[in-house]
């Protein structure tokens, strides 16, 4: 992260620019909100949570950034502004590319309208709850209730709370609250005193850090945004503890969407068949090339595909030595008349197909109604030639 820059602030009076020398504008690179979001993303990278909730999610920008993480399977946003949730839910919808190249694991994203100081059992058992620039918007009554709801009732494995550092404010042109809706802004001592008390009451430990490094010469004020990272002692709640909680559904669902994933059989089948047909066609074209080479009396015999020079580099495929060895040791494709047979065992040695599904029986059941199989089901069968083939020798 770069330090903040101090830039002279100009005002406009009667259409003329006037320099206001005592005042400085602080500009962060990257912008401060992006630094806060990046802090959360770094935590997700390190801890790989499966269930994440953002309290006070606002326009859902953080959720949009988090939905790309393969470890997350449930992503929830809660906000008091229902209109904002309605207008930003579309940000979280799957893109077309996420259907073409789906996730490995399921992901459900839900936005709830409600107050962060209300108890809703659908947020129990989460790995990470984020409260980014939230607590300063709570009045004194809600702030008093906040710890018991988030740390006592929801009791996630980790909580991240960020809030403005009031000690940084004198560096800004206007030494007032940074937002008209802020009910308070704490110094580092005030925030840390509150956070340590909360951690002690609810069996958490807390570490303090921040984002928004001050300009040179002002290091004594600390970060512009102060952050507390709370980690529950002993890890997550045990499953019995979560299950003992009574169902309380006080939040109103505003938006929900589910992402396609390879855990869904229809999606797996679609991707598997597509990748299999690509590999089959590569092998078919390669076999044709060897036939042409043989006809010109300068290449290998049709049955000896692997003696072809650099066979693994055909059509851009790149394999490790171990992958090459696994492919070469598998049953080879063969031709009977105008029919080309590619054993399933062979196909499943190719990395992309192997990653999708390594179980031959399951692959057979998934593709049976989409491709032609041999009578014993051991091989995919296609025509050796088709009308789309490019045959340069005929031109």
From Swiss-Prot:
UniProt subcellular location: Cytoplasm
> What are its cofactors?
Mg(2+)
The answer on whether this UniProt entry bears the keyword Magnesium reads yes
TM region(s), chain numbering:
none
Give the tissue specificity.
Specifically expressed in testis.
- Tell me yes or no: is RNA-binding among this UniProt entry's keywords: yes
**Some GO term, biological process aspect, for this entry: which one?**
piRNA processing
Q: Where does Mg(2+) bind?
A: 133, 136-137, 182
The entry lists its GO molecular-function terms as: metal ion binding; O-methyltransferase activity; RNA binding; RNA methyltransferase activity; small RNA 2'-O-methyltransferase activity
Sorted UniProt keywords = Cytoplasm, Magnesium, Metal-binding, Methyltransferase, RNA-binding, RNA-mediated gene silencing, S-adenosyl-L-methionine, Transferase
| Catalytic activity, EC | 2.1.1.386
- Quote the catalytic activity from the record: small RNA 3'-end nucleotide + S-adenosyl-L-methionine = small RNA 3'-end 2'-O-methylnucleotide + S-adenosyl-L-homocysteine + H(+)
Q: Which Gene Ontology terms of cellular component type are present?
A: cytosol; P granule
Per the UniProt entry, the disulfide pairs are none
Q: Which domain of life is it from?
A: Eukaryota
Q: How is the cofactor bound?
A: Binds 1 Mg(2+) ion per subunit.
Q: Name one Pfam family in it.
A: Methyltransf_23
* Residues bound to S-adenosyl-L-methionine: 79, 115
Q: Which Gene3D superfamilies match?
A: Vaccinia Virus protein VP39
Function according to Swiss-Prot or TrEMBL: Methyltransferase that adds a 2'-O-methyl group at the 3'-end of piRNAs, a class of 24 to 30 nucleotide RNAs that are generated by a Dicer-independent mechanism and are primarily derived from transposons and other repeated sequence elements. This probably protects the 3'-end of piRNAs from uridylation activity and subsequent degradation. Stabilization of piRNAs is essential for gametogenesis.
Into which family does the record put it? Belongs to the methyltransferase superfamily. HEN1 family.
Q: What is this protein called?
A: Small RNA 2'-O-methyltransferase
Organism of this sequence: Mus musculus (Mouse)
Q: Per UniProt, what is the name of the gene that codes for the protein in this document?
A: Henmt1
């Amino acid at each position: 992260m770069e330090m903040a820059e101090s830039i002279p602030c100009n005002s406009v009076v009667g259409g003329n620019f006037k320099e206001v020398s005592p005042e400085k504008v602080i500009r962060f690179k990257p912008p401060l909100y992006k630094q806060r979001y990046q802090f959360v993303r770094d935590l997700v990278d390190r801890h790989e949570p499966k269930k994440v909730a953002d309290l006070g999610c606002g326009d859902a920008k953080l959720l949009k950034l988090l939905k790309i993480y393969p470890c997350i399977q449930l992503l929830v946003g809660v906000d008091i502004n229902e209109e904002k949730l309605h207008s930003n839910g579309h940000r979280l919808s799957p893109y077309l590319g996420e259907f073409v190249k789906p996730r490995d694991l399921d992901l459900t994203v839900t936005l709830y309208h409600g107050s962060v100081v209300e108890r809703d059992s659908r947020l129990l058992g989460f790995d990470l709850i984020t409260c980014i620039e939230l607590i300063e918007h709570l009045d004194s009554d809600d702030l008093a209730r906040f710890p018991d709801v988030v740390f006592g009732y929801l009791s996630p494995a980790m909580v991240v709370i960020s809030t403005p550092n009031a000690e940084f404010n004198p560096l800004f042109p206007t030494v007032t609250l940074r937002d008209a809706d802020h009910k308070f802004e704490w110094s580092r001592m005030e925030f840390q005193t509150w956070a340590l008390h909360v951690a002690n009451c609810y069996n958490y430990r807390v570490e303090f850090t921040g984002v928004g490094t001050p300009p040179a010469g002002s290091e004594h004020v600390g970060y512009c945004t102060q952050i507390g990272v709370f980690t529950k002692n002993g890890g997550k709640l045990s499953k019995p503890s979560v299950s003992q909680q009574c169902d309380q559904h006080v939040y109103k669902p505003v938006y929900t969407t589910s992402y396609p994933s390879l855990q869904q059989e229809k999606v797996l089948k679609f991707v598997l068949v597509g990748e299999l047909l690509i590999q089959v066609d590569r092998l078919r074209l390669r076999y044709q090339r060897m036939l042409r080479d043989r006809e010109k009396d300068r290449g290998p015999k049709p049955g000896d595909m692997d003696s072809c020079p650099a066979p693994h580099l055909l059509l851009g495929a790149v394999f490790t030595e171990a992958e090459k060895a696994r492919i070469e040791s598998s049953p080879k494709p063969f031709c009977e008349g105008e029919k080309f047979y590619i054993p399933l065992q062979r196909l499943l040695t190719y990395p992309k197909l192997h990653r999708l599904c390594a179980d031959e029986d399951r692959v057979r059941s998934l593709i049976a109604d989409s491709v032609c199989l041999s009578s014993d089901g051991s091989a995919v069968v296609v025509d050796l030639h088709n009308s789309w083939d490019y045959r340069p020798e005929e031109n």
